[in-house]
A protein has these predicted regions:
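Helical scaffold of the NTase/Pol beta-like nucleotidyltransferase catalytic core
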Residues: 1-41, 163
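Short, flexible turn/loop "capping" segments at secondary-structure junctions
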Residues: 2-5, 50-54, 98
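Short amphipathic alpha-helical segments
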Residues: 7-9, 55-59, 102-104, 122
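Active-site nucleotide-donor binding segment shared across nucleotidyl transfer reactions
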Residues: 28-70
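Short amphipathic alpha-helices in soluble, non-transmembrane regions
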Residues: 71-79
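Short aromatic/hydrophobic-glycine micro-motifs
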Residues: 78-82, 171
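Conserved catalytic core of two-metal-ion nucleotidyltransferases
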Residues: 81-114
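Catalytic cores of NTP-dependent nucleotidyl/adenyl transfer enzymes across multiple folds
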Residues: 108, 114-171
C-alpha cells in the first residue's frame, strides 16, 4: 500500500514494495533532473525496515544550491510532482499525489547541509540500531492514535524524539 489521504495519519507495517517504489521514483528523478541532482536517497520511516510508517515514500534530493531546482518546477509538474512553497523550512518540497491521496514527499536539500545530513543519519542510525528503531516506532504509534486527523500536530509531536535520536546518531 502506498498513499494516504492528505492531512491524515495512519501507520502501517513496513512493506517491501516501498523500497522498489522508491527506486523507481529515484530513477525518474535522475532522468528529469540530470546533473542537478547530486545524490538521491530513499529516506524517512519507509526507508527504515523494522518500523511502522505512513505509506508515503520520502525521497531526499541533494543539490549544490536550493535555487538549482527552480527551473525544474514545470518539468516535475508534468510528472504529477507538485511544488509546495514554504512547506518545510530549509528545503524545497514537492509532493506526488493523486487527487487528495499523497504518495511521495520529495525533499530538495543542499548537499552538505544539515537537512541532507539529518535525513541520511537518521535513516542509517535506526536501521543499524533496532532497539532505537523500536523505541521510535512505539512513540510514533502512540502519536498516530492521538493525532490521527491532524498530520501537522503528529509531525510536530515527533520533533523532540527525532532530535534526541539525531544527537545520538551524530556522536
Amino acid at each position: 500500500m502506498i498513499g494516504l489521504k492528505s492531512g491524515t495519519v495512519k501507520l502501517v507495517q513496513h512493506q517491501e514494495e516501498w523500497h522498489e517504489n522508491a527506486e523507481n521514483v529515484i530513477s525518474v528523478l535522475k532522468q528529469l533532473l540530470g546533473d542537478t541532482a547530486l545524490d538521491i536517497q530513499h529516506v524517512g520511516s519507509t526507508a527504515i525496515c523494522s518500523i511502522h510508517a505512513k505509506p508515503i515514500i520520502d525521497i531526499a534530493v541533494a543539490v549544490h544550491d536550493i535555487k538549482d531546482i527552480l527551473p525544474y518546477i514545470e518539468v516535475l509538474k508534468q510528472q504529477n510532482i507538485f511544488f509546495h512553497e514554504g512547506a518545510v523550512a530549509g528545503e524545497v518540497f514537492f509532493v506526488m499525489e493523486d487527487g487528495d491521496i499523497r504518495t511521495h514527499h520529495i525533499h530538495i536539500v543542499k548537499r552538505n547541509g544539515t537537512g541532507w545530513s539529518n535525513y541520511i543519519s537518521f535513516r542509517d542510525y535506526l536501521n543499524a540500531n533496532p532497539e532505537k528503531a523500536m523505541m521510535y516506532d512505539e512513540f510514533k504509534r502512540k502519536s498516530a492514535v492521538r493525532f490521527a486527523d491532524d498530520r501537522k500536530r503528529y509531525t510536530a509531536s515527533k520533533q523532540e524524539i527525532i532530535g534526541q535520536l539525531l544527537s545520538e546518531a551524530n556522536m
